[in-house]
From Swiss-Prot:
Gene3D superfamilies: Cytidine Deaminase, domain 2 (3.40.140.10). This is UPF0758 protein aq_1610. Keywords: Hydrolase, Metal-binding, Metalloprotease, Protease, Zinc. A motif (JAMM motif) lies at residues 180-193. PANTHER family: DNA REPAIR PROTEIN RADC, UPF0758 PROTEIN YEES-RELATED. Belongs to the UPF0758 family. One of its GO terms (biological process) is proteolysis. Zn(2+) binds at H180, H182, D193. One of its GO terms (molecular function) is metallopeptidase activity. InterPro entries: MPN, RadC_JAB, UPF0758, UPF0758_CS, UPF0758_N. It comes from Aquifex aeolicus (strain VF5). Pfam families: RadC (PF04002), UPF0758_N (PF20582). The keyword Protease applies.
Amino acid sequence: MGQARDRVNYSFKRLKEIPEELRPREKLLKLGPENLSDEELLAVILGSGSKGADVLSLSKELIKMGWEELEKKSVEELLKVRGLGLVKALQVKALVELSKRFKGGKSRISIRNPQEAFEFLKDKFDERRESLIALYLDLSNRLLDWEVVAIGNVNTVFSKPKDILFKAVKLSANGIIIAHNHPQGEPSPSNEDLNFTERLKKACELLGFELLDHLILSEGRYFSFREEGVL
């Protein structure tokens, strides 16, 4: 048996103990984000620790809590974490919220007028058949979610108000925009379109939602019920 060797410690507890080239920012620059641990990525975002806690120790403590727990905690509760001051608590809450908004690829974009609704919707339809899409917005007209509510044939699509309102209740939405396409023909409303819109508007009012608009899209153009004074 050879001479006993000093034990090699791969786990550095404090940032200042880590060789400069292996610190989170330097690693990110040299190796890319995919080669950093969760703690290291959070340390890059937080930037520095405090007198009471090194940034890596602080990041490790926060990651250990888990994303769902961080989402639930208020700023006041986060301030109880050793070394986490007000600015960093706000950074954590902002990061969690931003991550939630981008989860699933659905960023919280704003839709404030018919043109913005059209720009969002124009590539969402199958040109071969009619479809009905619903957009669900919050009080600030930010998109909470959207879905294809119904798919029909080349000339018609059938739906009921409850098909749209069920998800609005689930999301606690404030406003709803519906849209459907006319694969063949002009983007102008039929009698069926007018009747359905009126029924949906009344159903929305009963449940405390606002029907913001109904758009009909066809061949790169649109008809807005709100813009034309029909709604």
